[in-house]
Every structure is written in structure tokens, then in C-alpha cells.
């Protein structure tokens, strides 16, 4: 049986957590941030958890994560 391929786009965007979930970067932070308040930019700084309903599809996309 051939090896399963990892979706490279998903591998770049998501990281697996210790408990089997996934985390990702906050959206709306790439560019044109001058009009955002400092508070808004600060809250977008960290990582977010992926919803449980989306975890199954990420496991299929990244079989070796």
C-alpha cells in the first residue's frame, strides 16, 4: 500500500496539540493593520484552537501529524 500524502497547505497552517487537537494562527492579522486598535491587535496575537467538528478532517489531511 502506498504512503499517504500530507496536504502541505494544512501542514503549514495547523499544528497538533498534545491532547490530539489542533491550533492555528488568528485570522485578520496579515496586513492593513494600521486602522486596528492596539487592543484588537493584541487579542489577535496568539493561537486559536480548531473546533472539534473540524478536527476529523484535519486528521485525514495530516495523517502523520
Swiss-Prot record:
The parts of the chain that form a coiled coil are none
| Span of the signal peptide | none
PROSITE patterns assigned to the protein according to its UniProt record, in alphabetical order: RIBOSOMAL_L35 (PS00936)
Task: Please provide, alphabetically and separated by semicolons, the GO molecular function terms listed in this UniProt record.
Answer: structural constituent of ribosome
Q: Which cysteines are joined by disulfide bonds?
A: none
Question: Which BP terms does GO give this entry?
Answer: translation
Q: What Pfam family is a match, any one?
A: Ribosomal_L35p
Keyword terms of this UniProt record: Ribonucleoprotein, Ribosomal protein
Gene Ontology cellular-component terms listed: cytosolic large ribosomal subunit
Gene3D superfamilies per UniProt: 4.10.410.60
Q: Which intervals of the chain are annotated as region Disordered? A: 1-22
Extract the InterPro entries matched here.
Ribosomal_bL35, Ribosomal_bL35-like, Ribosomal_bL35_CS, Ribosomal_bL35_sf
Top-level taxon of origin:
Bacteria
Q: Which family is this protein grouped under?
A: Belongs to the bacterial ribosomal protein bL35 family.
Name by which UniProt lists this protein: Large ribosomal subunit protein bL35
Q: Which organism is it from?
A: Francisella tularensis subsp. novicida (strain U112)
Amino acid at each position: 500500500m502506498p504512503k499517504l500524502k500530507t496536504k502541505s497547505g494544512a501542514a503549514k497552517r495547523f499544528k497538533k496539540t498534545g491532547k490530539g487537537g489542533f491550533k492555528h494562527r488568528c485570522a485578520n492579522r496579515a496586513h492593513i493593520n494600521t486602522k486596528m486598535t492596539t487592543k484588537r491587535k493584541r487579542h489577535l496575537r496568539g493561537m486559536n484552537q480548531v473546533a472539534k467538528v473540524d478536527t476529523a478532517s484535519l486528521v485525514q489531511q495530516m495523517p502523520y501529524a
